[in-house]
């Protein structure tokens, strides 16, 4: 099994953080903007995603720690945990660990974005740029459990072990059997689907 890789599609807060004199308001805005994009990929756009972002930012206690990195990590994890709970409430079986999952013969051998023929910067540009709607339509076409694993790994930047732990802890009883190996294999399936989409888009040009 390939070693785990932490392939964040984009950072929840952009690398260029505001100077201290810019105040905490700018930090809140940066945190919230990245978190909403993440929430909408997990839950869809709308009031529910907005609510989870507000709660995650509040729980990050930015005003206390005044550390953007700590705020980013805390709010990102809080939001993903809350989103998993919402998904489990919507459909308890949607986050169930796939039974009897074994390494399949798919087009991607490694569990990283490079194996799909795209860099994290390129995919970040697709999500934020003109290809945004097409990328989101592709994500929405995936089964919930594949979409969630893909977003947690590629977008939020969690490792396979962290992804499995989040699903077990917050995905409801049906998600109790998730393992790091299962998260790796499902992520590979998502990467294979992404590679197929990229090939189709390239052929259509």
Predicted segments, located by residue:
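Short, aromatic/basic-enriched loop-to-helix "N-cap" motif that marks the start
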Residues: 47-51, 63-82, 176-180
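Short amphipathic alpha helix immediately N-terminal
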Residues: 137-166
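Short, small-hydrophobic-rich alpha-helical interface motif
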Residues: 31, 35, 39, 52-61, ...
